[in-house]
Structures are given as structure tokens and as C-alpha cells.
From Swiss-Prot:
Residue numbers binding Ca(2+) 3: 353, 382, 384, 431
Gene3D superfamilies with a match to the protein in the record: C2 domain, EF-hand, Phosphatidylinositol (PI) phosphodiesterase, Pleckstrin-homology domain (PH domain)/Phosphotyrosine-binding domain (PTB)
Protein name: 1-phosphatidylinositol 4,5-bisphosphate phosphodiesterase delta-3
Region (Substrate binding): 73-101
Gene that this sequence comes from: PLCD3
Enzyme Commission number: 3.1.4.11
Disulfides per UniProt: none
Cellular-component GO terms for this entry: cleavage furrow; cytoplasm; plasma membrane
Family matches, as PANTHER family: 1-PHOSPHATIDYLINOSITOL 4,5-BISPHOSPHATE PHOSPHODIESTERASE DELTA-3 (PTHR10336:SF33), PHOSPHOINOSITIDE-SPECIFIC PHOSPHOLIPASE C FAMILY PROTEIN (PTHR10336)
Binding positions (Ca(2+) 1): 195, 197, 199, 201, 206
Chain segments carrying region Disordered: 461-519
Pfam families, per database record: C2 (PF00168), EF-hand_10 (PF14788), PI-PLC-X (PF00388), PI-PLC-Y (PF00387)
Organism: Homo sapiens
Active site: 352, 397
Length: 789
């Protein structure tokens, strides 16, 4: 037996009289895709079978993309290069070619890696360098992760529109695909590539090439034996049904078959009562017979079985591969938390040095960095403001070689993109190094560009001693900045040393700052001060304010070093402070390469605005993405009750005894990506590591053994167990690596989620890349048990 069953003894439920007949009819698995044969008229273009399954072969925009277009790639005012762009027949990728005499180079980008397709001059690059091309002829392809935007100009407006519409349709179709459809599409793509002479037949050499492409290092003798067993025509070529049979054997999931047969018995189909028993053993909330019947109607592929409320092995697999069968609780993927509590009661997704796309020494600044941050659910962005020419403030990392962008352009990007993913409020964290005149210009730009989005006065509230809620501030923009004291001179200069507010105390990290700039930063424009309604940037002087003088609008900014010191020395007091008002934590200025710190320690103490360098991928950003994966990815996650109570006794350094046992049996993986596509014989040796990130006493990591030369369907069957003291704060990170005995392991994929959103039972983990992009159809298959004391 593959793994221990945690089921009760049962009596086989009565089945409908037709069950045996239906079982016999549906026992044969649903057909897998295979290259078209001459009978279906597809020999000349076998790859189009994939687009046909997407229902797009007759779409005029897609057909135009298949023919290809000569588009101009725009990088600067003088760099406009023509490229041939053509959609590949798999519908998954776009091929483009440079026009270099004698040595044309070819490149590919994948549709699933596209974040957005914009028409017109809707990117920083086209606004700056696309003036020679009419907006109607221009488009921008924005990618996920760190890849730069692709700014293009078409020969005509109609051709540009075809690419905008075509890519939009392809993205929508890919997003709507079930896991089974993704797998079918993935197979089509590799079959098309492995069929070197495009004759819709597969020689043994082509089969070996296919196996290497999909990350399988199969023994030649075994591969040839399998090949010959499927070669019923005995002509050393597989075609049609023979290829289908080979793929079915390759894709066989014995571990799923075993689980299925535990519940279906000899009938080879699940009745609705049997499926209900499986759901109950899984620990599914709301498991009823009606729910089991609904799942059959949703995921069963065979119409005969569906009519008789029966589920075949294929339908069972489709259910387990669906979002409802995933480890992440599907009900947590929409906004499900109370959004009517004060802002201080939420973790808020926050970015540091948002304007940078690379390091903070010489990297470029870009408004596109803000667009990307908002696309990742960020709700608090940083604007590092300095004196600019012509009376216009600029944003860059001061006293470095980073490039500069206009403050007003960033505000416009906020207006256009801040609420495309989430309706909840955005906080603009101003690091202000400007004089009074340009501060007034900043205030003017904020008011005129943002208009009614900008919060300029306090809302009517039944409890003025608390911050407003995310629900009350939907669609609004808050400014975090210095606030003038009540008594001041008209020019904004009457600030005593005692009353002077600290902005981000980043000035202490920047010893190179000129004295003149420091003097400018101490002056506060009345116009800009008036906009800091709910987020007054203030030096943290005490964790014990007077009980009769609550100041919920004060926001303290701390370096990671100062925050860690407070956590160690005054853990519970810091927790209570963060239950009342906002705290922002930012990386040390010494992180010149824009590296990140682990945000978990700050979340443990209730810090809301834990700012990270979004431009730098790594486990720290994986944790951030995992924390904000739930609640509709809206950028706000309600803190646990122990971090919201003003009289909380919780201390992250002393969380108490273990309260939860987490057991995860790592069973198998499927279709892991190939790390080095340029080396056909390079196959991964995968291992799985599970990490717990929480309070210090809960942090742990364990890993499986590695499996030699199999990234296609490796098997482990190993159980990893963890004891947790504060499960409500814990994140679980699943990591797959390629084992290397002589050097650090290579990253393959990961997925991170809160323990509170982890479902029990047999589940799939859908892996993500370093940049957070889907690696579909790559998955882990695991069994999860959570025991709470």
C-alpha cells in the first residue's frame, strides 16, 4: 500500500442497478491527445491541433498572428528595430527573429508569462520614445517577473489591434483551462517539437527526444520495450492510437489509482455515496451527497458516467487536479475576511524603493516598477522624492547613479493602475528630500492627478480613536508623510527638536547625504502636510503612550535592525503598540544589491507595513506572496486575534507549548520543468523540502531523499512532521530542488501558503517559478494531516 489510510470501516453503499453496465462502458480511459493522422486532414500542420482544442483556429486575429507580422521593437528614441513576430502553432509561444545578415537569431516568449497587453502609448518606454509612431499603431507586452516590457509598433493600426486582441484571447483561454486541458496542451506542444519531420509519426529516436524534453531519463532497453509494446503495426513508428497508448502508459498515476480503488472497489467507478465518503475522509467541510453529485457533474469527462452520477478514474483525477482539489483552500481565494476593522488590524502588502527595477546603486528607476508592484497586490508603495530641474520633483535613490523619473509620472501611474487588481486603499509612503516650493508642487500634482481618489480630510467615523477600515477607504489613496505641529510659522519652519518628526529614519543610514539636503528635508510644506490625514510619519519615542491620548494616525518607520531589537527586548509591548497604530519596516541601507530580509519576524510582532524590494526574487518574496495569496490577493490580510487585541499577552519570543502537529506525506511529483533546455541530456534529480516560517520556535525545514534522473513522475512516499506553537502565524513553503552532490542545489519550483489556508487530505501543490509564474502542469501530490490540541 502506498500510504496509510485514515478511514473508518465502511459497508459498501448500494449502487444503482446500472452501475455495473456503466462501469464497463467507462472503464476504458478517456482518449489522450495524439498528433492528427491523414484521416483528419492535419498532416501538413499537426501543431494546429492544439489551437483547435482552444477553439481559436478560425479566429481571424489568431490566424494573422500565425502568419506573422513585421513589428518594430522600440528601446530608445533612435533604437527602433524591425523583427518578425509569429505565433507558434502550439498557441503557447511567440517566435521572433532578428534581421542580422547571415546570422539571424531566433527567440521565443510564452503567452503564459504575459502580465498584460496594453494598446497605445501606455508604457513609460512608448511615452518617452514612441513619439514617431501613432498611438493606434503601438502596443506594449508586459511580462511577469523581472523581464522588461516589449514595446512594439505595427505597420498599421489594424495589425496592432490584431496582436492586442489575439494575445488577449490566448491569455484568457489559457487562464480558463482546466488542469487536464493544460496537460493536453503541454503534451501537444512537446509532441509537435519532438516530431522532427512533422509526419505525425514517432520513431524511437523521436520518442527518446520526447522523453528528454519532458524530463525523463528512461533506460534505453525499457524505453524500447515500451515503444515496441505500443507499436502494434510493427513498422517501427508510432502513430495515432499507438502514440495515445504510449502517452497513457507514460502518464499513468498508480498512486491515484490506488486511492481510487480503495473507494470504488471492483466496479472501477465511484458512486456519489462513495465519493462522499472520500470527501468526508479528506476532512472536507460541507461534504454532503448533493456536493458529491455536483462534483461528478463538474469534473467527470464521460457523459454516460455523468448521466448515472458515477465518477471514473479520469474524473477523479480532474477533481484532484482542480482548484477545489488543491492544497490551498479554494474559499480563501476570494475576499473572505472581515474588512471593516481598523487599518492597524491588517497585514498590508508593502514595497520598498518601489521605483527601482534593479539594485539601489546604479539600477534604473521606472514608473513600470509601480505598475508591476500593483499587479502583485502591493498596497503601500514608496516615493523617494528629490529636487528636480524646472521646478519638477523627481524620484530616484538619492546620491546614487540610479536614473530619475518625474514625480507626476509616478502619481499618474498610481491613478491608472493602483486599483486594477484590488479595490482596497493604497498608501503612498513619501520619503521627502525636497524644499518647500517643490513640496508644494508635489501636493499640487497629488490633488490634480488623483482628484477624488485622494483622502484630503478625515472621514466621518463613530470612533475617531481608531483608524478607518479598508472597506471605508475603498478606491482611496492615503499619503504617509510628515505632519506640521499645531503651532508653526507660516513658512513651515518653526519645528522644535522635540517636535520634529522622523520620516523613515533612513536619513540615519545615509551618511553621504549633504547638509543642504538635510536642511531641506526638515522643512515641511503646509500643502503637503495637509495631505497626511491618517498616516503621520512620526519618530517612535515610546511603546507606552498615555492612556488618555491615543494617536492612531501616527506611523513609525523602522529599519529591520531596529525592529528586530524591539522584538527581542519588548516583544509584547511592541505587539500591543501594533494593535493600535501602523508600523513600517524597511531593509537596511547596506543592502546595496536590493536584497531582502525575512518578513516573517516582523509579522510575528504585528507590524503591518513590512516593506520588501519587490524587484528582487527569492524566498523572502515567496513568503510575501504566500502571506497575501489569500483573501482575494487584495493586499490586506486580517492579523490573528492575538495581534489585534490592545491588551494582548502574546509574545512571539515566548509563544507557549506546541498546539498543532502537521504531518505531510510527499507522494509524487508530475511534469517538473527542465532546468537546462539547451542540454537535452540534462535531467533533474528532484528532492522536496518543506519549510515552516513562523515564530522562532516554529521555524523548521525537512526534506526528502532525491530521486535520480526523473523530473517527469518521481515518487517518494516519505512523511515529514512538524510541531507548531503559533499555527495562526505560520507559512508553509514547499520547495523542489535539483540535487547536486558537489554544489548548491538548483531551484526548480516552489509554492507558499498560510497554514490556516492549508486543506487536509490528498492534495496537489501547483508549483511556481522564482518570479511567481505558474509552472503548469508541474505539481506535487501530497497527503496532509493537521492535528490540533
Amino acid at each position: 500500500m502506498l500510504c496509510g489510510r485514515w478511514r473508518r470501516c465502511r459497508r459498501p453503499p448500494e449502487e444503482p442497478p446500472v452501475a455495473a453496465q456503466v462501469a464497463a462502458q467507462v472503464a476504458a480511459p478517456v482518449a489522450l491527445p495524439s498528433p492528427p493522422t491523414p484521416s483528419d486532414g492535419g498532416t501538413k500542420r499537426p501543431g494546429l491541433r492544439a489551437l483547435k482544442k482552444m477553439g481559436l483556429t478560425e479566429d481571424e486575429d489568431v490566424r494573422a498572428m500565425l502568419r506573422g507580422s513585421r513589428l518594430r521593437k522600440i528601446r530608445s528614441r533612435t533604437w527602433h528595430k524591425e523583427r518578425l513576430y509569429r505565433l507558434q502553432e502550439d498557441g503557447l509561444s511567440v517566435w521572433f527573429q532578428r534581421r542580422i545578415p547571415r546570422a539571424p537569431s531566433q527567440h521565443i516568449f510564452f503567452v503564459q508569462h504575459i502580465e498584460a497587453v496594453r494598446e497605445g502609448h501606455q508604457s513609460e518606454g512608448l511615452r518617452r520614445f514612441g513619439g514617431a509612431f501613432a498611438p493606434a499603431r503601438c502596443l506594449t507586452i508586459a511580462f511577469k517577473g523581472r523581464r522588461k516590457n516589449l514595446d512594439l509598433a505595427a505597420p498599421t493600426a489594424e495589425e496592432a489591434q490584431r496582436w492586442v486582441r489575439g494575445l488577449t484571447k490566448l491569455r484568457a483561454r489559457l487562464d480558463a483551462m482546466s488542469q487536464r486541458e493544460r496537460l493536453d496542451h503541454w503534451i501537444h506542444s512537446y509532441l509537435h517539437r519532438a516530431d522532427s519531420n512533422q509526419d505525425s509519426k514517432m520513431s524511437f529516436k523521436e520518442i527518446k527526444s520526447l522523453l528528454r524534453m519532458v524530463n525523463v531519463d528512461m533506460n534505453d532497453m525499457y524505453a524500447y520495450l515500451l515503444f515496441k509494446e505500443c507499436d502494434h503495426s510493427n513498422n517501427d513508428r508510432l502513430e495515432g492510437a499507438e502514440i495515445e497508448e504510449f502517452l497513457r502508459r507514460l502518464l499513468k498515476r498508480p498512486e491515484l489509482e490506488e486511492i481510487f480503488h480503495q473507494y470504488s472497489g471492483e466496479d472501477r467507478v465511484l458512486s456519489a455515496p462513495e465519493l462522499l465518503e472520500f470527501l468526508e475522509d479528506q476532512g472536507e467541510e460541507g461534504a454532503t451527497l448533493a456536493r458529491a453529485q455536483q462534483l461528478i457533474q463538474t469534473y467527470e469527462l464521460n457523459e454516460t458516467a455523468k448521466q448515472h452520477e458515477l465518477m471514473t478514474l479520469d474524473g477523479f483525477m480532474m477533481y484532484l487536479l482542480s482548484p477545489e482539489g488543491a492544497a490551498l483552500d479554494n474559499t480563501h481565494t476570494c475576499v473572505f475576511q472581515d474588512m471593516n476593522q481598523p487599518l492597524a488590524h491588517y497585514f498590508i502588502s508593502s514595497s520598498h524603493n518601489t521605483y527601482l527595477t534593479d539594485s539601489q546603486i546604479g539600477g534604473p528607476s521606472s514608473t513600470e516598477a509601480y505598475v508591476r508592484a500593483f499587479a502583485q497586490g502591493c498596497r503601500c508603495v514608496e516615493l523617494d522624492c528629490w529636487e528636480g530641474p524646472g521646478g519638477e520633483p523627481v524620484i530616484y535613490h538619492g546620491h546614487t547613479l540610479t536614473s530619475k523619473i518625474l514625480f507626476r509620472d509616478v502619481v499618474q501611474a498610481v491613478r491608472d493602475h493602483a486599483f486594477t487588481l484590488s479595490p482596497y486603499p493604497v498608501i503612498l509612503s513619501l520619503e521627502n528630500h525636497c524644499g518647500l516650493e517643490q513640496q508644494a508642487a508635489m501636493a499640487r500634482h497629488l490633488c490634480t492627478i488623483l482628484g477624488d481618489m485622494l483622502v484630503t480630510q478625515a472621514l466621518d467615523s463613530p470612533n475617531p480613536e481608531e483608524l478607518p477600515s479598508p472597506e471605508q477607504l475603498k478606491g482611496r489613496v492615503l499619503v504617509k508623510g510628515k505632519k506640521l505641529p499645531a503651532a508653526r510659522s507660516e513658512d513651515g519652519r518653526a519645528l522644535s527638536d522635540r517636535e520634529e518628526e522622523e520620516e523613515d529614519d533612513e536619513e540615519e543610514e545615509e551618511e553621504v547625504e549633504a547638509a543642504a539636503q538635510r536642511r531641506l528635508a526638515k522643512q515641511i510644506s503646509p500643502e503637503l502636510s495637509a495631505l497626511a490625514v491618517y498616516c503621520h510619519a512620526t519618530r517612535l519615542r515610546t511603546l507606552h503612550p498615555a492612556p488618555n491620548a491615543p494617536q492612531p494616525c501616527q506611523v513609525s518607520s523602522l529599519s529591520e535592525r531596529k525592529a528586530k531589537k524591539l522584538i527581542r527586548e519588548a516583544g509584547n509591548s511592541f505587539v500591543r503598540h501594533n494593535a493600535r497604530q501602523l508600523t513600517r519596516v524597511y531593509p537596511l541601507g547596506l543592502r546595496m544589491n536590493s536584497a531582502n530580509y525575512s518578513p516573517q519576524e516582523m509579522w510575528n510582532s504585528g507590524c503591518q507595513l513590512v516593506a520588501l524590494n519587490f524587484q528582487t526574487p527569492g524566498y523572502e518574496m515567496d513568503l510575501n506572496a504566500g502571506r497575501f495569496l489569500v483573501n482575494g490577493q487584495c493586499g490586506y490580510v486580517l492579523k490573528p486575534a492575538c495581534l489585534r487585541q490592545p491588551d494582548s499577552t502574546f509574545d512571539p519570543e515566548y509563544p507557549g507549548p506546541p498546539r498543532t502537529t502537521l504531518s505531510i506525506q510527499v507522494l509524487t511529483a508530475q511534469q517538473l520543468p527542465k532546468l537546462n533546455a539547451e542540454k537535452p541530456h540534462s535531467i533533474v534529480d528532484p528532492l522536496v523540502r518543506i519549510e515552516i516560517h513562523g515564530v522562532p520556535a516554529d521555524c523548521a525545514r525537512q526534506e526528502t531523499d532525491y530521486v535520480l534522473n526523473n523530473g517527469f513522475n518521481p515518487r517518494w512516499g516519505q512523511t515529514l512532521q512538524f510541531q507548531l506553537r503559533a499555527p495562526e502565524l505560520a507559512l508553509v513553503r514547499f520547495v523542489v530542488e535539483d540535487y547536486d552532490a558537489t554544489s548548491p542545489n538548483d531551484f526548480v519550483g516552489q509554492f507558499t501558503l498560510p497554514l490556516s489556508s492549508l486543506k487536509q487530505g490528498y492534495r496537489h501543490i501547483h508549483l511556481l517559478s522564482k518570479d511567481g509564474a505558474s509552472l503548469s502542469p508541474a505539481t506535487l501530490f501530497i497527503q496532509i494531516r493537521i492535528q490540533r490540541s
